[in-house]
C-alpha cells in the first residue's frame, strides 16, 4: 500500500475464540465475510504500530465472524492484537454498480438543496433497516434518508456535491 493512498477501515479485532488462535472480527463490509476478499490488510494496533497481513481466512458462525491469521496460533497471540483496526487501500475495493456508492466515498461531500441552500457536509451514514441515512453536519445536524430519486436527486463526485430535495428548515 502506498503511503499516500487512501485507507478504508473495514473492521477490527475484537477478541479471541477458543484456545487455538482463532480471532473474533468485527466487519463493516456487506456482507460481513466480504472483508476476506480485500487483502492484503494494513493492521493498525491501538498504539499506532502498522503491519501488513495477507492470507487471513475466516467464516461466519451465528452472529460472529471468526478468522485465522498466519503466525497466530494461540490465545496469547490473539490477545496481543486485540483492538487492532483492519484497513485496505481504496483501490482494493471493486467499482460500485451504477447508482450505488460506497459510504466512505460520500463522506465529506457538500449537501445542497434543489434551491442551492448548503445544508452542510456528509459526516457519515448508517442503515436504519429500511434505508440508508445521511448524517449531515452544518449549522445543525440533519438526518436525510439516502433514497434515490425521492430525496437524493444527484451525486456529483467531481463537484463534491450531493443535491437533495429537502426543506432546509427541517
Curated annotation (Swiss-Prot):
It is found in: Cytoplasm. GO terms for cellular component: cytoplasm; ribosome. SUPFAM superfamilies: PRC-barrel domain, Translation proteins. The keyword RNA-binding does not apply. Disulfide bonds: none annotated. GO terms for biological process: ribosomal small subunit biogenesis; rRNA processing. Belongs to the RimM family. Binds ribosomal protein uS19. This is Ribosome maturation factor RimM. It comes from Xylella fastidiosa (strain Temecula1 / ATCC 700964).
Amino acid at each position: 500500500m502506498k503511503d499516500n493512498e487512501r485507507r478504508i477501515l473495514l473492521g477490527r479485532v475484537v477478541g479471541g475464540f477458543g484456545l487455538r488462535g482463532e480471532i473474533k472480527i468485527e466487519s463493516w463490509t456487506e456482507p460481513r465475510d466480504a472483508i476476506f476478499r480485500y487483502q492484503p490488510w494494513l493492521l493498525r494496533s491501538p498504539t499506532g504500530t502498522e503491519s501488513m497481513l495477507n492470507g487471513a481466512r475466516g467464516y461466519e458462525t451465528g452472529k460472529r465472524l471468526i478468522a485465522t491469521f498466519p503466525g497466530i496460533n494461540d490465545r496469547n497471540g490473539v490477545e496481543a492484537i486485540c483492538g487492532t483496526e483492519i484497513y485496505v487501500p481504496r483501490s482494493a475495493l471493486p467499482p460500485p454498480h451504477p447508482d450505488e456508492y460506497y459510504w466512505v466515498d460520500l463522506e465529506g461531500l457538500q449537501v445542497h438543496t434543489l434551491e442551492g441552500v448548503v445544508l452542510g457536509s456528509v459526516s457519515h451514514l448508517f442503515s436504519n433497516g429500511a434505508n440508508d441515512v445521511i448524517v449531515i453536519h452544518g449549522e445543525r445536524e440533519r438526518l436525510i434518508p439516502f433514497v434515490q430519486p425521492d430525496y437524493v436527486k444527484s451525486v456529483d463526485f467531481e463537484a463534491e456535491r450531493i443535491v437533495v430535495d429537502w426543506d432546509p428548515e427541517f
